[in-house]
Amino acid sequence: MKVDELRKAFLNFFEAREHRVIPSASLVPHGDPTLLFTTAGMVQFKPYFMGLETPPASRLTSIQRCFRTTDVEEVGDENHLTLFEMLGNFSVGDYFKSESIDWAWEFLTEVLGINKDRLWATVYIDDDEAYDLWKKKGISEDRILRYTAEQGNYWGPPGDSGPCGPCSELHYDFGTPVIEDENYNPDKDHPAMDTGRFLEIWNLVFMAYYQHEDGTREDLPAANIDTGAGLERLAAVLQGVRSAYETDELRSILKSAEEVTEIAYTPELADQNANGLRVITEHARAFAYLAADGVLPSNEGRGYVLRRLIRRACLLYTSDAADE
């Protein structure tokens, strides 16, 4: 399935389940001083979750362009991205855990046809309800893991304060790790070990709390659902590749980078050239979207981040060219 076909399938699925389709918001958050960039699909919906504004519908769905600065230095490997698209379905006081788990499972296994035996679920350490719901879907107990917040199963807030809640993640099992380790034991491997065997593809956040800057929490006006599935990651699974850069849309940009630099992409060698071409590909795409949303290079704030991307891509390009 091509990336654009995946976009259409997702929106059609949730629109058929009475979700209002909402366009992607700008990468520059509107009226939210706590964030430099739009980092998640729920950002434009924060006022609805907090009870500050009335949503156009209680069920919403979107494909949101997101930008995260935390991964800038990691870009260059097979999967890290600063700019990505987040498939999301949201409930503002409407449905909760049962429906969100039902629909995530249905979309992945029935619409996309992903092998059920390849899916693992993680739940927050004390979330018995989510655990039981995944078990009813047929996931064996050894593939339903209880994780702490430190292991990634508590989401938010997106910024110094805001909505948050425990979450449940779905991971795809490729069957083999990426790392080479003679002591590797597949029976002890699990998603939190970061061996490359597992890829997180969907995060379901049970958003029922508001966290203040001092870390204290209180109940939101209603229990909400905020889910996010990485478009590029899902596309990699569906297209049978391990790298986001091998998916059809990113690969087309990477081919252009090969032509401009006159450097061949050889990921099997895991060399500096492959790393550099991935950086150029990713940062060029991020630059295009940021600039389209009004971000220009400068010495501070958002503009400084953009300038940093340009500098990093140029440095790697000149370094790679010198090696040729």
Language-model regions, residue ranges each:
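Conserved small/polar residues in nucleotide/adenosyl-binding loops
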Residues: Y317-D323
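Alpha-helical segments
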Residues: M1-L306, R311-L316
